[in-house]
Every structure is written in structure tokens, then in C-alpha cells.
Amino acid sequence: MITSELSVLQDSTNESAVMHTDMTAVSADLSTELVEDLEVKGKRKRGRPGRPPSAIKKPRKTPGDRSRAEPGSRGRGRANGHPQQNGEGDPVTLFEVVKMGKSAMQAVVDDWIESYKQDRDIALLDLINFFIQCSGCKGTVRIEMFRNMQNAEIIRKMTEEFDEDSGDYPLTMPGPHWKKFRCNFCEFISVLIRQCQYSIIYDEYMMDTVISLLTGLSDSQVRAFRHTSTLAAMKLMTALVNVALNLSIHQDNTQRQYETERNKIINKRANERLELLLQKRKELQENQDEIENMMNSIFKGIFVHRYRDAIAEIRAICIEEIGVWMKMYSDAFLNDSYLKYVGWTLHDRQGEVRLKCLKALQSLYTNRELFPKLELFTNRFKDRIVSMTLDKEYDVAVEAIRLVTLILHGSEEALSNEDCENVYHLVYSAHRPVAVAAGEFLHKKLFSRHDPQAEEALAKRRGRSSPNGNLVKMLVLFFLESELHEHAAYLVDSLWESSQELLKDWECMTELLVEEPMQGEEVMSERQESALVELMVCTIRQAAEAHPPVGRGTGKRVLTAKERKTQLDDKTKLTEHFIVALPVLLSKYSADAEKVANLLQIPQYFDLELYSTGRMEKHLDSLLKQIRFVVEKHIESDVLEACSKTYSILCSEEYTIQNRVEIAHSQLIDELADRFSHAVEELLQEAEEADEDEIYNVMASLKRLTCFHNAHDLTKWDFFGNCYRLLRAGIEHEGMMEQIVVQALQCSHYSILWQLVKITEGNPSKEEMLALRKTVKSFLAVCQQCLSSMTTLVKEQAFMLLCDLLMIFSHQLTTGGRENLLLLVFNPDVGLQSELLSFVMDHVFIDQDDENQSMEGDEEDEANKIEALHKRRNLLASFCKLIIYDIVDMNAAADIFKHYMKYYNDYGDIIKETLSKTRQMDKIQCAKTLILSLQQLFNELVQEQGPNLDRTSAHVSGIKELARRFALTFGLDQIKTREAVATLHKDGIEFAFKYQNPKGPEYPPLNLAFLEVLSEFSSKLLRQDKKTVHSYLEKFLTDLMMERREDVWLPLISYRNSLVTGGDEDRLSVNSGGSNSKGSSVRSKKGRPPLHKKRVIEEESIDNSWVTRNDTIQTPGALTTPQLTSTVLRENPRQIPEQIPEQESEPSSEPDFLHSPQMQMSWLGQQKLEDLNRKDRTSMSYMKVRSGVRHAVRGLMEDDAEPIFEDVMMSSRGQLEDMNEEFEDTMVIDLPPSRNRRERAELRPDFFDSAAIIEDDSGFGMPMF
């Protein structure tokens, strides 16, 4: 038998141990006799329903059973009827047996039952300890505790034995081993009740003890006890429900036997059998009553309290099991008294609990026989279930839709039209499982054939090959009424799994489009035909590609062999059908641009080999003929691009039909080229006197050629010459031919790109490259001219082409071993850069009022605004791309950056990314650009309001706010950005003192107010750099300036204070010392030099650490070209000469301030050397005072061990919105929960050690930039 550890149960003394062993043996003998006696009485009283009397036998003894009588056989535990040994020879407990799961569960339970028969107290003690250990408790219930203590006292004692260091317990531990343990745990309880259902559960001891214990544990405040006991109780209840169901079945069978026997005639009636049947029915009823009492105890004592437990897992267990009870024993449990708990829990705040509710209800609604019992529940909670189709948890929404589908399947009257409409629109959901579930609902509601045979007969009478005609029309009507015509692909994808037969019925769709309606059929409108064509093309795409449309799913998944075969079969089927049908469809709808554009998408999904293998070349000729007619009829871009793409697909080299298609294509281009050439000559001859027909002929021919030139190499026709002539004429006669100029620009652009492709792929001669260079140069000049003349449409087109060509023909062209193409590299001159920037300022950063006025009265006002914004964003992005790749000077970005706040909603993401990339290129130049943008805003404000600015005005506050946002972009690592920030302060100081006040030296310089803006960056300076910048500031100050205290001098006072104060508040302790709390705590304990030594380090190195690390901290080089892109950086032309000649200049433009990274890196050093060489006693005494203050503050920090909390993100301003302004590539640092000031003081000097800096940089989880 399985016992608990008797060594734990026994007393510590030898005498008491002997006595306890004797008493245990006696107790075991007595309890065995008592149990056997009770079982005999129970059998005589109730019998064993469902089993013949001969089945009442004791379990057969095993060899291990005999070992129980041997002395010393009691150990830590027993399993399978004999002591189990682990690897070290120690027996294992019941918990360990179940956890290992190596033994058959029924054998484990049978052994426990036998031990119960021998000593029920010991066996129950094993079971109690099993539940305790399954809860993760290390304690053990002793036999004296079990006999002498109440359950509440035992649970309180076990609570004290919990391991408080870990919150995990078996049911919550991760991994497959513990997942299997949960299954074994549930199986053990189920098998235990099943094996005890004929005897032990009726002894009024075992079940009472277990239920009482589980009830107490389920009410514990310890989550592990509550969770484990609730799971055990619910599984126990489920097993009892199964027993009750069996008893009910036996009762019914016994009653039928009794009625049959009683209805016999008296001569054949067996009175003894009647008496036995009556006795059996009575015993069954008594057993049923006992089981019901047990179930009521569990339900009222545990379920009613735990279904609303604070822990979602516990609530989910309760709901899951009550669903099992209602399905298993619907006569007893499927009523409103139990359903209400599921209905109430539909409103649970946790998705997993709501999901269990829906799963439970699905199992009930699947059985249509149960619908009458669910009618009241459906009426009461239907609205809630329908609303859950919009649940924020997608898994819940999917199951809610499936439940609604089951309700519809069981009773169509249960759902109103409004309920159905709430589900219909979900077929357009971006989440595919939701959409597919809604598609299944839609299929059952609208597209299921109620009487297939009758519909097939009707179709034959009407001469149709498919009975799906009405369903296809219904699908079209649904699509049109949903008013989401751009989402046909989503609708098809949603219905694909449930309505494939309908969606693949391309013969039916073609019949509806081509053939005339039969008598009694309703004629399809033009709008319905367009919708049907769109849906048909979407079904073809879905069948050929076998993956969801863009926006649904995470990407293309690998198809299974079966799916791949289905895909190939579908592709063959659609190709065979549409090779014949497509020319007919194009012929009928050749005048309808929308239908033709959709129909021409079909050939890309063909298996083109079938043209030759199936000998269908005549159908190919028909298709090419129809495409040519379409090209001649239409000038819409969508139609022409579809024709061009179709030719490109059919011309593929891997198919034998290539030559036939290329001949047709060349003939078409020859004809279009001749028309274009003649039309251009006529137009240029007439010039300003050209009529509309001549202009239209040129525009139509050019538009067709442009669309074809996009996908085909047409350079042998040399369209660039005529296009260039049109462009020159358009510039001379401004406004005459706007559309022609736009198309000519685009066609010329394509021609240049195709010429470049030829040169890069071959071995070009110098003459070929010179010719292309000449072509590009002339085209760039024309585009530049278009920027200053012509209409807005032409300007925008010219600007985009200029940006693209400057990017393509930049230094990136020579990378990858293509140095021979250096002749083709173009660098924009200052004039072109200026014009591009002016265009951005005039056409991108425009006032909203102007835009609103220009669109006032438009019916599609909102759509036009969105389209206009999208166009402006593209213009800005194109120009910013030139800045990022160093094609346009970085200073041009100042005009972009200054609009960051004003246009944050429209362009904030683009400007932020540009700033991030420019900082990666050159930190120092980026900082100079930022301060330049602020200077520009300041100058604009001075020009508007004069030099006497109102410091409290909204305009000044706006500039300060922009400066604060810029400061946040430097991130938290002040070591990496120190030179850039110092350079920014230098430029700002020079700007503030650039112009002296003409009224005299007693008046502030004209730009002095700018220092208030500059003070926003002071928090980004290191402590020693603040002193350096302060010293540089003092160079510009006179004694008179330092004494002034009037309001006009407040910006200077404020800026000086920001440099002088706050030295002990900088964030060195959180910059580079570790990016997380764990790393910080390690650094604070390991490798830390003695405190007195660290003081010396700080005093000696705090003033010259910037000198010793000049070779360690370097400005990043040019921006590395990102992978998977065709753009490459050209070398920075502004390289640093080894020696800079001396030159005379004003103080604000000294040689050491030239734009040179190396010289900029040395600026702090030069300033510090000047400070060290100064012999001004006042300054030296001031520094001594500062040093003394630091010593005093450090002494206070060492003596004060009070924990502090610091939020590094809030240290500059303390405003929560600052968090959102950090760039995505800015390091986020997590501080430890607390650190006393002593630790922070001890940590600081590490950051002035070059070795520590290297260590810290390598320790970051991600780079700063």
C-alpha cells in the first residue's frame, strides 16, 4: 500500500517510536477488519449496481502485496502495492508516482484502494498529503494532526510551510513535464472515483473527508491551495456526475425490467424477481441521493465561490467543468439554475475566462436536441454573445462568431437581421481567423443551397451548366450593399474555406457575364457586372496563389503537399477555362475601362505552357488582338499599365510563345511610335496655335508609350529626343501643355533608366557613357527649369524626378566594383540644392488654412486632403533622403528641423528619422544643424517683433519647447554625445554675442535672449564640460555685463546658472554604467576600488578626463549604407586636411572652430588648457571653493544611507510627455529599485575611467545610435 513517510510521522524518541509502530500496526489490523465489515454490510444493503454479484471480489494479491506483512516494509511511501525505489533506493510518495507518470493510473488507484481497505486513516493521509504536495507545499500532514486537528488548523499549519521565495507551484510551472503532471493529476482523480464508485464512496468517510479538505483548501488565501483544490474538486465533481449518470441509467433499466415483469400474467410473474428489482431500485435511489448530496456539497461549497475567484485560471476551471456537466448529464444540469453562471461569466474581464464560456456553450449548441432547453438562455444572453464577436481578444471573437453560427444553424429565428448584420461586416476584418469565422456564418446564412436537386433541375431548364447562378448573384449583391468595393479580395478570402465550390465556379460567372439572361432571369446591371468581374478576378488570384491577400496573415506559409496539388489543379482548371473565355470577355467589355483593367489581371495567373501543350495558339492570337484594340481605345493609366504588364508576362523567355508575343508587341510599338512622331511634328509646327486635337493626339500617344516604357525597354525607338523637344517647347509656352510635359518628363526618365541598365549590365564604351551623361545633364537642367516655371503639377513631377536621379547618379553608382561609371556621377551644385530646398518650403510646409481654402466646396473634401497630405509627405521624404545620403549639404536640414513642432502631426515621423540618420552620419555636424535651425527661428522672430522680445510670449515658448525636444533626442549617454553638445553650446554662445547693441555696451547684445533657448541643452553637458563652456562664455562677458541684473539680462543670468549649478545632479550614474539594474548592482559590488582611492581618482581626473579619452571617444563616420537597398553613400567631400593653415579671423570664426571633426574634438581640450594656464587668482579661488563644496557634498552622501529613487527620463524636465520624444534608437535605462547615495557616490568615478567606459559600452544590449 502507499503510505506517507512514517519517519516524519513518528516521534523523535525510541520508546515513542516503538509504541507508535505497535499502535500503527494494531490500528491497521483493526481498520482493515472494520473496512471489510463495512463493505460487507454495504454490499448486503445496497448491492453493486450495474455489476453481477460475482464481480464482488477482492483485488488479486501481487508479490508486492505479500511484502507488506514483512517487518520493516513501511517506508517513505508505497505505490503499485509495494515499495517503489528511486535511483537512490528510497521509496517515493503518491505525489511522485503521479508526477513521474510511469505507472498505469488504474494500477496506482487500485493499490491505494487496497491500502484504504487495510487502514483507511493511513490511506486518506496519503491522499491528503498528495493534495498538499500537488499545491507546491513542502509540509507534510502527520497522523496525529490528521486525527486531532480540524481541517482549518491543518491548512493554517501547511500555509506556514510554504516556500515564500517562489510563487510557482506544479500547476503553474512551465514545461511539458508539468503539463503532463496536470493531465496525470486530473486522470488520477477521475480514475479514483471510477474505481470507488461501487463501494468506498458510499462509506460516508472517504468522500466526506476529501470534500471537506478540498472545501477548506479552496477557501484559502494561498493561491496555490485554491487553484489546486479547485481543479481537484471540479474534476471530482465531473467524475461524480458520471457516476450519477450511470446510476440514473441503471435506475431506468431497473424500472423498465420491473414494469415488464409486473405486466406479465400472474401465472408467469416471478414474485421473487419483483422483490429483487424493487430492492435494487431502492438501493440505486439511495446511492443516487448520496451522490447528489456530494455534488451539492462541492457545488455550493466550492463552485459558487470559486467561479468568481480573483484568479482567472480558477474561474476558467469552474466554467470549463460546468460545461462538461451540462453536456454529460443534461437532464440534471442543463437548466437555468446552472446556465446563469455561464451567462454571467460572459462578462468576465479576462479573455481566457470568456473563451471558456463560449467553448462550453458551443458544446451545448452543437447538439440540436438541447435547443429547447437553451431557448430561455438564448433569449437572455443572445445580445451579449453577438456583441462578443467584436471582442478585443481575437480568440474570443472567433469563438463568439462560431457560437453565433451554431445558434443560426439550430434556429434561424433566434437571430434578428440586426444580429446577422453585426457579424456580416466582420468578413472584411484584417484578422484572418475572425474573417474566416464570419465567412462561415455568411455561408450558412446566405450561400447554402437549401434544395440542391430542385436548383439543379431549374438550372438545366434554363440552359445553365451550373446551379450556382442565384448564389453568385447574391454574393454580388452582398458585396455591393456592404459598400466596401476596394475589399473584394478580403471578402473572397473570408469565404474561401467555407464556399470554395461557389467561388471556383468560373463557368457560372462567365455565363452570367457573357450570355443573355434566360426567360424569368433578372438582368444584371452594369454595376453588378463590374462587381462580378472584380470578385471573379479575386477568386482567380486566391486559387492561383493559395495565400491570403496583402494585410491578412503574417506572410506566405509553406504549402502542404495536398494544398500544393490543389493549387496546381486549380491553376490548370482556370487556365483552360479563361484561355478561351478571356478574349470573349475583353471583346464584350472592351469599352469599359474598369472591367478591362480587371480582366487583364487574369493572364498573370495562367499556366502559359498550356498555350503550346494544348495547341491553343489561336486563342493566344485572339487575346493579343483584343489587347491591341484595348490599347487603341483607352488612355487611362490603369488600363494601359495592365496591357503593358500582360505583354511583359506573355513575353517571358521560359515559354515557347515568346516569339509570337514579341512580334505582336513590336508591331504595336512601331505603330504607336509613328503616330507619336507625326503628332509631335504637327504640334511643334503649330506651336501656340495648336488646336485641341493636335494636343490630344500627342498626349494620348505619349501616355501609351510612357506606360509601356515603364515595363519594356523601348530605347531602340529613341523617344527621348522628341520628349526633350516637347519639354523645351513646354517651358517656352508655359501652361499650354501641362499633361504633355508631365508625360514627357516621365517618359524621358524611363528612357534614361533603361539606358543606365544597359550600361551597368554590359561593358560600355566611353562614348556610350559620355552620351548618357550628356542626356542626363540636359534632362536635369530641364527639370531644374521646371521648378521655377510651369504649373504645380509639373513642378511636383520635376522635383520627384530630380530627387530620384540625383540619388541614382550619386557616388553609390561606383560601388561594387563599378568604378568605371565614375563619369556618370552627378553632384548637385549650390544653386540646385537651394532650389530644391525652396520647393520643399513652398509646397510642403504650407499653412492648413491655405489648403482648406483651396479645397473648399469639394464633395470629397476629406479624401482630397488625405491624398494631398500623402503627396506632400512623399515630396519631403524624397528631399530628406538626399540629406541622409549626403547628396545635399546637411545644413539644409536646418530648414526642415525647425518645423518639427509645428508640423509634428503631418511630418513628425519623417523629420525624426532624418534627425536620427544625420546624427549617425556626423554627430557634431548634426548638432550644428540643430542649433542653426533654432537660430533661424530666433532670427525670424526678431524680424517680426524686434530685438526686445517678450520672454513669456507663445513664440518664444515655442522655440524653447523645440529646443527641449531636440535636447531629448541626444539620449541619456552623455559620454557619447559630449563633443556634439559642447559644439552646440559653442555655436549658440557665438550667435548670442555676434551683434553688439548699437546703443552701447551697457545694453545687451541683440541676440542675447537666445541664451534662454540654449539653456535647454545645459542638462546634456557633463559636469566638467559645464565648467569648460562656462569659461568660454566668460570670454564674451565684460565686467559690466557680469554685474547687470535687469530683466533684459535675465537670459544671460539663467544660462550662467544652468552651467554653474547642477554639477552634482548630472546623470553620470545612469549613463554608461550599465543598462539595467542587474548590471548596475554588479558594478556596485565587484571591481570597485576603495573609497579613498576613488576620491583621488575623481580629484585628479575629473578636470582632465576629456583629454585622456580623445583617442577613445570618436565622432562616428559617415552613415553606413543599409543592407537590401540600392543606395550607397558617396564619400564625404569634406575630408579633414592634415594641416590647416593659419589664418586671421574674427573671434567668432577662429580656425579651431572650422567644420572639422578632429578639430572639433579638440575644442574642449583647447578650452580646458586655456583654463589651466590662466593665472587669474579669482578664478582659481572659485575653483577651490567648488572643489571644497564637492568634498562636503560627497561626505554627506557617504554618511547618508537613505534610499533614493531617480527617474532618468524625468531628470531634464520632469514631464511625462518627454518619454515619447526619445528616439527609437535611444537607450532606455532601467534603474535598480533603490540605491543609497553612498553607492551612487562610489559608482560615479568609474565613468571617468577609460577602461570602465570600454567595458560599459560593450555591456549595452543595443547601440545608442
Curated annotation (Swiss-Prot):
- Record PTM: Phosphorylated by PLK1. The large dissociation of cohesin from chromosome arms during prophase is partly due to its phosphorylation.
| Bias-annotated ranges (Low complexity) | 1069-1082
Give the InterPro entries listed for this entry: ARM-type_fold, Cohesin_Scc3/SA, HEAT_SCC3-SA, SCD, STAG
Which residue windows does the record flag with biased composition (Basic residues)?
Answer: 1083-1095
Q: Where is this region: Disordered?
A: 1-21, 37-91, 1063-1097, 1111-1130
Any idea which GO molecular function terms this record carries?
chromatin binding; protein heterodimerization activity
The protein's UniProt keywords, in alphabetical order, are: Cell cycle, Cell division, Centromere, Chromosome, Chromosome partition, Mitosis, Nucleus, Phosphoprotein
Biased-composition ranges for Basic and acidic residues? Answer: 62-73
Compartments annotated for it: namely:
Nucleus; Chromosome; Chromosome, Centromere
Q: Which GO terms describe its cellular component?
A: chromatin; chromosome, centromeric region; cohesin complex; nucleus
Q: Mind telling me which Pfam families this protein's record contains?
A: HEAT_SCC3-SA, SCD, STAG
Looking up SUPFAM superfamilies in the UniProt record yields:
ARM repeat
The SCD domain sits at 303-388
Biased composition (Polar residues) is annotated at 1-16, 1111-1129
This protein's source sits in the domain of life called Eukaryota
An example GO biological process term is: sister chromatid cohesion
The entry's family comment says: Belongs to the SCC3 family.
What is the protein's known function?
Component of cohesin complex, a complex required for the cohesion of sister chromatids after DNA replication. The cohesin complex apparently forms a large proteinaceous ring within which sister chromatids can be trapped. At anaphase, the complex is cleaved and dissociates from chromatin, allowing sister chromatids to segregate. The cohesin complex may also play a role in spindle pole assembly during mitosis.
Partners and quaternary state? Interacts directly with RAD21 in cohesin complex. Cohesin complexes are composed of a heterodimer between and SMC3, which are attached via their hinge domain, and RAD21 which link them at their heads, and one STAG protein (STAG1 OR STAG2). In cohesin complexes, STAG1 is mutually exclusive with STAG2.
Name of the protein this chain belongs to: Cohesin subunit SA-1
Which species does the entry assign this protein to?
A: Xenopus laevis
Gene name, per UniProt, is stag1
